Each structure stands twice: as structure tokens, then as C-alpha cells.
Swiss-Prot record:
Transmembrane segments: none annotated. Belongs to the tektin family. GO terms for cellular component: axonemal A tubule inner sheath; axonemal microtubule; microtubule cytoskeleton; sperm flagellum. It comes from Bos taurus. The gene is TEKT1. Microtubule inner protein component of sperm flagellar doublet microtubules. Microtubule inner protein (MIP) part of the dynein-decorated doublet microtubules (DMTs) in cilia and flagellar axoneme. Forms filamentous polymers in the walls of ciliary and flagellar microtubules. This is Tektin-1.
Length: 418
């Protein structure tokens, strides 16, 4: 108990002074450290504030640059999309032209086939593989070749339109994405420290797994632009090709059409000349038939006319056989009567022979008449087929090129016919 009530030990004055000095020094040191910390803190605050302002300014600048870059590419894509849309619209018109041109060649093909079919109805010697038939066959081959070429070109045009639409889809998708990106970056660029809708978000400092590098981003848009340019250039090339094909095919058909029509004209002239010559020969044969018929009448009359003298001579000879006795003499009169009978018999034989020949010739002339009439009919049939059935039907050739400008393929007017 005595120890508990014992007063604490007292320090020496020197110890007291040392203890106070230690407190002074520690307080001074603590204050000094605190002042330095305050100064350092202010410097740090100023530095960080400056750095933050600089970073935010740099971010704003980067956002602005990014906006300019995205807007630049958006404009590029817009321009390419507009060009591609125009090119596709043109190709759709060319597609329609090709379809109409292909359709328009069906009638000329039908006409050519009908002409060949009609000309198969020529008969006899006129069923000849003449120049008209050769040129019609060539025209048929040209039209078939043209239709094959137009069909193939139409397929190429449809495929090019499909490729254009694919490129257009990629451009539109890229444009939508860029529009969204511009909208987002515009919002980000407009934000400041006093914006009401700023807030903390969790886990924002990360790299999205589906994000791409700037090089990939540039390559993506550049690839879309290059593809659009390629398809547009292909479209322009195809348009020029279609123009050439439509012009050349129409020109080829028109030229062959002219050749065929010239062949028809020459063939008709030749056939009509042959018919006229046959008709001339028929007239001469008819005249000769009439002459021969008259000749036969004359010969028959001449034979008939010999009957009287023959009967007289025979009667005289028979009567003179009744002379009596020595009067039955072979005198000059007897010999002359015998000679007369022989002459008449011989002459009648000659007349009958000539009459027989005349009948033979008349039959020959009649056969020739029938042959000439049949041949003339054959020629008339050929002329009818070519002049009445074929030539008028061909006036609707050549076909239109499928354009809506009222012109024929190749640029000639619709009333122009081959």
C-alpha cells in the first residue's frame, strides 16, 4: 500500500529542458513535413489538374480528329454508294433493253423459219438449194447466234446487278455503322465536366474482344470502297459492251437481211424470166400443135382424095380383063394403069407414113405442152411462195434493240426495213 501511494520520480531540470527541446524539434519537423506535403500536394494538384486538362483537351482533339476521319470515310462511302446506285439503275435499264432485244429477235427467227418452211413447198425442179435458201439458212444461224449472245450477256448483266447490290449492301451497312459511330463520338465530344449526365461506369477500361485495330478499320472501309469502285467500273465496261453488242447484232442482222432480200429479188427475177421463156415456148408449141392438127387434116384429106383415082384405076384394070381373045393385050394403057395403081398405092403409103409421123409429133407436142404448163405452174408456185408469202412477211425485220427511244438497234428509225 505504501508503494502504491509513492509519488512518481522527478526529473532533473536538464532532463526537462531536453524533453521540451525534443518536443520543439519533433513539432518543427512534423510541421515542416506537413508544410512540404501541403506544398507538394498543391503542386501535385496543380500538375494533375494541368495533366487532366491537357489529357481531356487531347482526348477532345483526338475525338474531333476521329470525327473528321469517320466523316471523311462516310462521305467517301456516300459518294461511292451514290455512284453505285446510278450504275445499278443504268444496268437495270440495260437489262430491260437486253430482255426486249432478246424478245424482239423471236419474231425475225419465226419469220426466217416460216420462209424456210414455205420454200420447202416448192415442187419439182424448183425445189433447189438456191442462193435464197442458203442466205435464209445463214440468217437463221445469225439470229440463233445473236440470241445466244444476248442471253449470255443478259446473264452477265444480272450477275453484275447482283454484285452491285452486294457491294451496295456492304456500303450501306458500313455507312450505318459510321453514322452510329459519329453520333456516339459527337455525344462524347460534347461532354464536359459540368455535363449533367456524366457518371462512373464499372469495367469501362477494357479492350472489347470484338474490337479491331485502326489498320483493320481502315482496311475494312477501303475494301468496301475498292469493291464498290470495281463493281462500278465493271458496270461501265458491261454497259459499253452491251451497247456494242446491241449495235453489232442489229447491224449484222440488217446486213444479212439486205442480202436475203436481194437474193429474193434476184431469185424472183430469175424465176419470172424462166416462167416467161417457158410461156413463150408454150405459145410456140401451141401454135405448132394447131399447125400440126391442120397438117393431119390435110394429110387425111389427101389420103381420102386418093381413093377416087385408085378406084378408077382398079375399075379400069378389072374392066379391061373382060376384053375378048387377042384383045386381052398387055398394051401401053395396061402397063400405064398398072403403074398408076402402083403410084397411087405408093403415094397413099407415103401419106399414111407422114400422117403417122404427124400423129407422133402431135403427141410429142401435146406432151411438151403439158410439161411446159406443169413447169409454168411450178414456177408460179415458186413465185407465189417467194413474192406473196415470204417477201411481205419480212418487212417487220430487223427487230428493235429494246430501247424505248423509238429507234431500231444500231440507231436507225423504226420505219426502216431491210
Amino acid at each position: 500500500m505504501a508503494k502504491l501511494l509513492q509519488q512518481p520520480p522527478k526529473f532533473l531540470r536538464a532532463e526537462w529542458q531536453i524533453a521540451n527541446k525534443n518536443q520543439y524539434h519533433r513539432a518543427e519537423a512534423q510541421r515542416s513535413r506537413s508544410e512540404r506535403l501541403v506544398a507538394e500536394s498543391q503542386r501535385l494538384v496543380d500538375e494533375i489538374e494541368k495533366t487532366t486538362r491537357k489529357s481531356q483537351s487531347d482526348v477532345n482533339k483526338k475525338l474531333e480528329q476521329r470525327l473528321e476521319e469517320v466523316r471523311f470515310w462516310k462521305k467517301e462511302l456516300d459518294d461511292k454508294l451514290e455512284q453505285l446506285v446510278y450504275a445499278t439503275e443504268d444496268l437495270l435499264l440495260y437489262q430491260t433493253r437486253l430482255q426486249k432485244a432478246l424478245e424482239s429477235f423471236k419474231e425475225p427467227l419465226h419469220i426466217t423459219e416460216k420462209c424456210l418452211e414455205y420454200r420447202e413447198k416448192r415442187v419439182g425442179i424448183d425445189l433447189v438449194h438456191d442462193e435464197v435458201e442458203q442466205e435464209l439458212i445463214k440468217e437463221h444461224e445469225i439470229i440463233r447466234g445473236v440470241m445466244t449472245l444476248l442471253t449470255r450477256t443478259l446473264e452477265e448483266t444480272c450477275e453484275q446487278i447482283r454484285l452491285n447490290r452486294s457491294a451496295k449492301y456492304n456500303l450501306e451497312k458500313d455507312l450505318r455503322d459510321k453514322f452510329t459511330a459519329i453520333t456516339i463520338d459527337d455525344i462524347c465530344f460534347s461532354l464536359n465536366n459540368n455535363s449533367p449526365n456524366i457518371k462512373y461506369s464499372e469495367n469501362v477500361v477494357r479492350v472489347e474482344p470484338n474490337s479491331v485495330s485502326l489498320e483493320d478499320w481502315l482496311d475494312f472501309s477501303n475494301t468496301n470502297v475498292e469493291k464498290a469502285d470495281k463493281q462500278r467500273n465493271n458496270s461501265l465496261t458491261l454497259k459499253a459492251l452491251v451497247d456494242r453488242i446491241l449495235f453489232q447484232t442489229a447491224s449484222d442482222l440488217r446486213r444479212q437481211c439486205d442480202v436475203v432480200d436481194t437474193a429474193f429479188k434476184n431469185g424472183l427475177k430469175e424465176t419470172k424470166d424462166a416462167r416467161d421463156k417457158l410461156a413463150l415456148h408454150l405459145d410456140k408449141v401451141m401454135e405448132e400443135i394447131a399447125s400440126q392438127e391442120k397438117n393431119i387434116v390435110v394429110l387425111e384429106k389427101a389420103i381420102l382424095d386418093q381413093e377416087g383415082p385408085a378406084k378408077v384405076a382398079h375399075t379400069r384394070l378389072e374392066t379391061r380383063t373382060h376384053r375378048p381373045n387377042v384383045e386381052l393385050c398387055r398394051d401401053v394403057a395396061q402397063y400405064r394403069l398398072i403403074k398408076e395403081v402402083d403410084e397411087i398405092t405408093h403415094n397413099v403409103a407415103r401419106l399414111k407414113e407422114t400422117l403417122a409421123q404427124a400423129h407422133v409429133e402431135l403427141k410429142g407436142l401435146n406432151r411438151r405442152q403439158l410439161a411446159l404448163q406443169e413447169e409454168i405452174q411450178i414456177k408460179e408456185n415458186t413465185i407465189y411462195i417467194d413474192e406473196v408469202l415470204c417477201v411481205p412477211m419480212r418487212k417487220s425485220i430487223p427487230p428493235r434493240d429494246g430501247d424505248d427511244h423509238g429507234e431500231w438497234a444500231g440507231g436507225s428509225h423504226p420505219e426502216a426495213v431491210c
